[in-house]
């Protein structure tokens, strides 16, 4: 919604100016700011205390959100033979090899995640310039280049998300839908924060979680207390 719209201003009024919310309170508040005829997505934006220009301070990885994302995730798999059959049985939306590459070369990118078996990566490389900028390129580090396609498909369909810090040291991720309970959103938030702390670069100095906000699609940002790194569903003391 436009920041000048009545709906946006009404949503903004529900956020206490100057308050930094405990995670559970932030989730309750962000649900109150939802204003839409559809079920908007709840996103988190995190400013990290890292220098992404340095290779030893890149932050990226995956995490399985305990309550899923609430979104129907479309998954494509580059595989053939038994692996292709396994991918289809696991629920992959599109499975293929050369023909899938050609389809993507033709401009098709109507999917949310891509998985490939190692033997197909040479073919996938032909569309790296299409998939890479969109964050869709299969990568061993995120578990999307694998021989266990069944596990990979089920994890992504079940709520596994990828995250990566951008050039400005910001990281964005989905936490769920506004229809989720505040507890479900806080649990998903906690899973992400726990994983971010686990993969914190040893070279990072100073405060790691510098700023955290949550918001619904096109809605105002709710500040989250970045010092809370446990008991995410607990009320502020």
Swiss-Prot record:
KW Ribosomal protein (keyword) present: yes
Gene Ontology annotations for the cellular component aspect, listed alphabetically: large ribosomal subunit
SUPFAM superfamilies attached to this UniProt entry: Ribosomal protein L1 (SSF56808)
InterPro entries: Ribosom_uL1_bac-type, Ribosomal_uL1, Ribosomal_uL1-like, Ribosomal_uL1/biogenesis, Ribosomal_uL1_3-a/b-sand, Ribosomal_uL1_CS
UniProt record, GO biological process: regulation of translation; translation
Assembly and binders: Part of the 50S ribosomal subunit.
Protein name: Large ribosomal subunit protein uL1
Species this protein is from: Corynebacterium kroppenstedtii (strain DSM 44385 / JCM 11950 / CIP 105744 / CCUG 35717)
Taxonomic path: Bacteria, Bacillati, Actinomycetota, Actinomycetes, Mycobacteriales
